[in-house]
């Protein structure tokens, strides 16, 4: 499965997922990303809306992983998880690098909100290994258009 296919199998893709840890094993060509995936439904009742599930994203057959430096104007050094969203940024990558990838490779990028920068990944297979059941947070971060929010 490609990273985009995995993303499409999730209720919200990787939108508002939170990266907690990244590990790369170059000998085994495996990248693991511990994350909390937003699996909530914005149309759900408030107490069920902020639903997250923790898991480990496993990229096997890792071809490359590139982390862009953060924008200095963003809170990149604040401890804690980093919120992401997945996207296609192949237009920003070297075409000769993309052509050199083995057949069957995928390339996908994560935009890291706290950095205003990207994490680019190329690999052969992607899967998520769930570590927890769905948990519900009390913080309101996902609102419907026109919804009144008490501050």
List the predicted regions and their residue ranges.
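Surface-exposed, interaction-prone regions used to assemble/regulate multi-protein complexes
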Residues: 1-151
């Amino acid at each position: 499965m490609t990273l985009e296919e995995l993303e499409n199998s999730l209720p919200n893709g990787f939108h508002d997922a939170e990266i907690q840890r990244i590990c790369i094993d170059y000998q085994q060509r495996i990248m693991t990303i511990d994350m909390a995936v937003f699996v909530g439904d914005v149309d759900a009742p408030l107490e069920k809306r902020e639903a997250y599930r923790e898991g480990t994203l496993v990229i096997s057959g890792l071809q490359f992983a590139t982390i862009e430096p953060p924008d200095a104007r963003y809170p990149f050094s604040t401890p804690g998880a980093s919120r992401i969203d997945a996207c296609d940024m192949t237009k920003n990558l070297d075409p000769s690098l993309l052509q050199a990838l083995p057949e069957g490779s995928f390339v996908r990028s994560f935009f890291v909100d706290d950095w205003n920068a990207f994490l680019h990944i190329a690999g052969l297979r992607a899967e998520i290994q769930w570590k927890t059941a769905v948990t519900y947070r009390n913080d309101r971060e996902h609102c419907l258009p026109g919804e009144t929010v008490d501050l």
